[in-house]
Amino acid sequence: MKKALWALLCAVIFLSEAWADKVSGVNIQRTGSLTMQDAQDALASGDYAKAFNQYHDAAVQGNNALAQFSLGLFFQNGWGREIDPATACRWFEKAAQGGIPVAQHSTGVCFDEGIHHAENPVTAAHWFRKAAHAGHLYSYCHLANLLMTGRGFSKNPVKALELCHPAAQQGSPPAQLWMGKFYLQGDPAIRNQREAYRWFAVAAQKQAPEAFYYLGLIMQSDSSRKHAPKEIRQMFEQAAALKYVPAYFQAGKYFHDAEPNPETGQLSAEHLAKAYLWLSAATHQSQDPEEISAAKSMLQQILAVMPKTWLAELDQKIAQHLQ
C-alpha cells in the first residue's frame, strides 16, 4: 500500500512539474528543494508524520505549490491522519493558484461538489478550463458534465460530447467512463446504449472497475439481445474483484441465483462460496440499506446449507479483500 501511494504521488508530482514549467507566467518557487526531497524520502519510507511536516514547511514558508498539492493528498487519502475533504480542497486551491494543472482539476471538483465552499458550477468550470488548457484533458469531461446537466450553464449535450471525446479517444479510462455514462444516462437527445457499451468496453480493456459494472448493467437490461446470466455475472464479478463496491451485491446475487446442480438441486460449491463472499462484502461496504437487507436475507439462506467448516477460510478471504 505504501509503495502504491508513493508511486502515485511521484507520478502526480512529475506530471505537475512538467506542465507547470510549460505554463507561461507561472513562477513556482524551487526554493526548499532539500525540504521537498526529505519529504519525498520520508513518504517513500512510510514516515507520514515527518513527510507531512516537511511538506508543510515547504508549503507555508516557501509557498511551494507542489508541496501544497501534496498536503491536499494527505488529507484526501488519509495518509497518517483522518480523511478531511474540506482541508484537502483548501490545499488544492492554494496549489491551483500556483499553476499546478492537477490541483486546478481537483479544485474544480471541490467547487463542483461543494466540499469546502457552497456548490459553484461557474467557479468549478473556471478551474476545469484552466486545467484542461494546461494539458489536463480529462478536465474537459467534468466541464462537459456541467453542460450535459445544465448546472450553471445552458444545456448543450452535443457540445458536452465534443469536449470529452478527445481525452477518451487518447486513452484516458476516466474520460472513457464519462463518455459511456453520457451515452447511457445523459440527456435523452444523445442517449445511445450501443455507444455507451462501446466506451465501457474500451475502458474495461484497461481494467477500469466501474466499466465492468456498467457493462453488466447494460447486458442485464438489453432487450435487443438476451445475454446469458453467466456473461452478466462475469462482468459484475470482475468489477467486484477490482473492489468496485456497487458490484458486490450484484455479483453475490447472481451467484446466489445461479442454476443449481441438476443432481443435487443445490448450488455448486464454487457458486455457494462466491455468493457468500460477495454478499458478505456488500453487507460490509454498501451504503444502500435495501441492498444490505437483501444481502443479509440471502446470506441466511446460504448459511443454512453451507458447511460451517468453510466459514473461517471464507471470512479470512473477505477480510483480506477489503483491506
Give a label for each model feature:
Residues A7-F14:
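Bacterial N-terminal signal peptides
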Residues L15-Q54, V60-Q61, L66-S70:
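N-terminal leader/linker segments that initiate helical-solenoid repeat arrays
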Residues D57-A58, K94-A95, K130-A131, P166-A167, ...:
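Canonical positions in the second alpha-helix
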Residues S45-N53, E82-W91, A118-W127, S154-L163, ...:
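Structural signature of tandem alpha-helical TPR/SEL1-like repeats
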Residues R30-T31, T35, D47, Q61-N64, ...:
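Short helix-capping/linker turns of helical repeat alpha-solenoids
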Residues V23-I28, H284-Q323:
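Terminal, low-structured helical/coil segments at or just beyond the last alpha-helical repeat
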Residues R198, L267-E290, A319:
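TPR/TPR-like (Sel1-like) alpha-helical repeat modules
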Residues T35-A42, Q54, S70-N77, S106-E113, ...:
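Hydrophobic face of amphipathic alpha-helices that form TPR/SEL1-like repeat modules
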